[in-house]
């Protein structure tokens, strides 16, 4: 079970975007996330008339490792760690480590 999922609001812990918040838009693999508005780089794109794309400089969000982000707890207004709790019926749910409150699915 992934502790950080698509649609979760996260806060960046390290790097040039430290302290910024954003929403996870894509999981590249088990360890990398693409977050809206975070880790933006400028890519130089060649024009391709076959695909109908124009050339130029495009800003693009690049993947960031999940160890460099933490889930944002709206109740406390701070970053928090995620734990897994097994309920009585055997289902597993994500909870905030600080409060034990269940994380709502996005």
Curated annotation (Swiss-Prot):
The keyword Repeat does not apply. InterPro entries: KOW, Rib_uL2_dom2, Ribosomal_uL24, Ribosomal_uL24_CS, Ribosomal_uL24_KOW, Translation_prot_SH3-like_sf. Keywords: Ribonucleoprotein, Ribosomal protein, RNA-binding, rRNA-binding. Gene3D superfamilies: 2.30.30.30. SMART domains: KOW. It holds the Pfam family KOW. GO terms for cellular component: ribonucleoprotein complex; ribosome. GO terms for molecular function: rRNA binding; structural constituent of ribosome. One of its GO terms (biological process) is translation. One of two assembly initiator proteins, it binds directly to the 5'-end of the 23S rRNA, where it nucleates assembly of the 50S subunit. Belongs to the universal ribosomal protein uL24 family. Part of the 50S ribosomal subunit. HAMAP family: Ribosomal_uL24_B. This is Large ribosomal subunit protein uL24.
